[in-house]
Amino acid sequence: MVVLFKAGSLGPATNSFIIAATRRGQIRLYNILQDTTIPEPKRKYIPSSGTYPKGFRVSGTHVGVKAANTKYPDLALISSDKPCTAAAAVFTTNKFQAAPVQLSKVTLEQRKGKGIQSVVINSGCANAVTGKGGLEDARSMAAKVDECNGTSEPSTLVMSTGVIGQRLPISKILDKIPTAYSNLASTHNAWLATARAICTTDTFPKLISRTFSLPSSPGITYSLAGMTKGAGMIHPNMATLLGVLCTDAPVDASVMKPLLLHAVSRSFNSISIDGDTSTNDTIAFLANGAAGGQTIASSTSQDYAALQKVLTSFAQSLSQLVVRDGEGATKFVTVRVQNSPCYDSARRIASTIARSPLVKTALYGRDANWGRILCAVGYTDGVTEGTVVPERTSVSFKPVDGSPTLRLLVNGEPEVVDEERASAILQDEDLEIIVDLGGGDKGEKGLGGEEAVYWFCDFSHEYVTINGDYRT
């Protein structure tokens, strides 16, 4: 059963857009996220503490970008005490790029990845497809933050998320930016409030932090922190999804973009909720070097390899939180395509499976319909000739409890499936699907060693309800 409440129908205390699904206790409040609305199963993903990078301060401030939001943070500010030694970002590939995307790309190009000091983010309005006026609004936001930082050079990246085609209440935002700046802090609560401020239909704030060391400076403990938002319109191909990653490690601007591209390709570009690529997708990575040590300036150095490994693993953990908060989702699914002659083909196949509505609805219905998975493998575009050979292809389910893998198809031949066990496996929230290509036609089975992993969720009735009432 799904119960809908219109804005204002329950009085001022709940004057918000609420969609509640009793099947899993999910509650979706558009742009108004508070402790009382976070579903109990999702609370385990919210950190109670963290270790945050030196020299970064953050804040979450209430503006009221959407009129229904009368008290909760919807303006996030992330700022380094000193200009960052390096910054990079990966942006949406959608042709209708939002004004903040256009502006931030130009700013990074002008600064050549150096001297970026802040990121300002509003939720509640995407500032996308808003013409010259929207671009001017984004410029005004950046300029106001630069003014607070005491610099006349462009040093602020801008992000926005929310409804497409509407102008920002720019005066309200500009009036509150000085407040956001004065509220900057380095505490865990400040980081959590900032992560909350960028949420829209998210049911919980997505924030993680991690410490690491580098081979050249084993005595220094570095920190990496990141926040992201997204629950729908998620099929990035940087590629609504936003993310900011910050570290106090010393990184040269020349290697910043390759580090981020590698991490994003194996994390944020390897997730899917509904197959839609947003106009606003942006992942930014800032390094201020505040922890000291030797600067990472070469892509062949041990430090570079170490940071690349840490950053990629970190980005995967952060991006997976987006999938776990997929609109209406009841399952977190890992699809692993292995023994492919090349990585790109394996990734294309994994992406196609993750986007398939038939696969996603079968999983929601707890139906072990492996034919839909195989069908998606077979129609995948752009794979290398000979990658998919039916008589060498196998499909199986890997349970999360450590019990033996359930084989569904082996070398092109269907197995006699224990439907009761299959149904039991599909009762769990987490599931792994393994597609083994057997090396394609490059030799005997197993000689193709490339593997790609994608993370996605199922499609439920609630997904339709949430998006059918998105602007209502």
Swiss-Prot record:
It comes from the Eukaryota. Keywords: Acyltransferase, Amino-acid biosynthesis, Arginine biosynthesis, Autocatalytic cleavage, Mitochondrion, Multifunctional enzyme, Transferase. One of its GO terms (biological process) is ornithine biosynthetic process. It is found in: Mitochondrion matrix. The active site is at residue 240. GO terms for molecular function: glutamate N-acetyltransferase activity; L-glutamate N-acetyltransferase activity. The record marks 161-162 as: Involved in the stabilization of negative charge on the oxyanion by the formation of the oxyanion hole. InterPro entries: Arg_biosynth_ArgJ, ArgJ-like_dom_sf, ArgJ_beta_C. Pathway: Amino-acid biosynthesis; L-arginine biosynthesis; L-ornithine and N-acetyl-L-glutamate from L-glutamate and N(2)-acetyl-L-ornithine (cyclic): step 1/1; Amino-acid biosynthesis; L-arginine biosynthesis; N(2)-acetyl-L-ornithine from L-glutamate: step 1/4. PANTHER family: ARGININE BIOSYNTHESIS BIFUNCTIONAL PROTEIN ARGJ, ARGININE BIOSYNTHESIS BIFUNCTIONAL PROTEIN ARGJ, MITOCHONDRIAL. This is Arginine biosynthesis bifunctional protein ArgJ, mitochondrial. The lineage of its organism: Eukaryota, Fungi, Dikarya, Ascomycota, Pezizomycotina.
